Amino acid sequence: MTAVVERLAIVGLGLIGSSIARGARTYGLAREIVAIDRDAGVIERVKALGLADVASTEASAVAGADLVILCVPVGAIGDVAAQIAPHLKPGAVVSDVGSVKAAVVAAVTPHLSEKNPFVPAHPVAGTEYSGPDSGFATLFSNRWCILTPPEGPTRRRSSGCRACGRGWAPSSRP
């Protein structure tokens, strides 16, 4: 599969984030994978598992990413968006994997500029396990990923997220 993005940043490396990293690596979604987590222990585990090319506890590690996927608890997503926003390159698409959308959109969009569209997403997949060791590349295989981009220019950017859905698991429906 051809890489969809040059640099993919995943913020939060629990089950979903680590599965995205594994899928991106397995299916060639990105030329470079960046893993960001506030927990240094998680970052050390990510390095040991070889889930990313770059692994950091710093929000600034999103710099240069074409796509940033927020894989953090819904209650923390606004704070995380505020931390990464100053480091986003113009044109970088920001997405999430939260199970609710209205609260996430309300928490994230005030921190992003028009140059960084937000495309909310909800991959309908998961297990009862958590942490970077629990992820697996096929978590999203034959699963839905619901995209909820707002009306307007951002909707045109959702093709990048649809492509990422294919990259996480080529057999999934974008």
Where do the model's predicted regions map?
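Rossmann-like NAD(P)-binding element
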Residues: 58-95
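Internal alpha-helical scaffold of NAD(P)-dependent oxidoreductase catalytic cores
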Residues: 139-174
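Short beta->alpha hinge that forms the Motif I/post-I loop of the SAM-binding pocket
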Residues: 38, 72, 97-99
